[in-house]
């Protein structure tokens, strides 16, 4: 580590992008402790900031979102660095999910489509794509046969031929039930919809645009060999590096730490050329809760969700024989953590738990970047000017303001209360539709008198007027 920046020299990051020295020391200590106690041959973990957290207004997207600001590494088998590949395991699922949501946005499928629509004749045809994405379908965890992660993968025809109605462990939506098999089937849906192989889609639609040149289907040197650590005498057994075939969409890929940071940055701040930011936000809405006792863990559309106090972290863990991986981002701040170890699990704790601990450590020490307020360059005209100002509903005062950058009406209660402001923007037909807050998705209708003057705002039968004594 560089004494000036706390960064390994190979990252080449300028000092101003690194963590404060005390925070960097705490992160380094957590990683060193995890490697020693967990008995990992090597362990590497990086802290990143998405581009939105560091770039000024008007900055282009020539550099993919997400950049490492600190790297902590421990172990010597091999000595890790940010360009060395490890296997990312189930973090692969996040890429499969993004591809599927993009096909939905492009009109090639609907998330409520039954599987039968895309894989005709399957005995699991009533399961819906949304249920498979969110592990709410009740589908069994693994395909039949030998453990797919450690054996030669079957082709798609073999995977589909082995399906039976008995593959369901629970009725849909009964409970969260993690299913690798579900993502093998979703990969098949992608291939049927697009006519392209899953790997070609990943490479052309995701990796190439994000300049993730160190992410691959098979390992490319330099890469860390993966091991199982003997529980009694600490020796290493090298694990096979399998081609998982039709199950590849569930966990095949390899990546460097620097590349995984780019992907994490994308999940925090998506490039709209790849997927709409609103669609990525949709992926972060829980489909099923994995932890019904304390509601600290859930699953969205291809993304794990973890609550840590008042914060929610988005991402995914990954494991394949010989490897564990983690990706976790705090989307509001654009700060995230990615990491690898080349052992099949840590003796104490887990790599995803370590990642979230490090993320909390950084966020506790780092203030969330504040975007500067900038004055508007023009006074709103037309209907926008008519709608801004004070309004009343049921004796409560509200203010409607215009945000020109977002092109949104913002409705806030006065004085500010616990209910967040509602934002409205024009939909494709020109109507005002809610984009956030209590009225997300609702339509704001403007009432006018015979002369055309605005008299009221109607939001789902809640009528706002200029006079507190009027109710309609």
Residues of each region from the PLM?
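Catalytic loop of the DD-peptidase/beta-lactamase superfamily, centered on the K-T-G motif
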Residues: 2-66, 83, 191, 196, ...
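An acidic site on a long C-lobe helix of protein kinase domains
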Residues: 125, 182, 256-259
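Short, flexible, mixed-charge acidic loops at enzyme active sites
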Residues: 57-60, 65-75, 227-236
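Secretory-pathway/luminal and periplasmic proteins that interact with or process carbohydrate-rich
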Residues: 54-56, 62, 122-128, 138-144, ...
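Short, small-residue-rich loop/turn micro-motifs
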Residues: 73-76, 136, 307, 331
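Active-site-proximal loop and beta-strand segments within enzyme catalytic domains
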Residues: 4, 17, 21, 36-43, ...
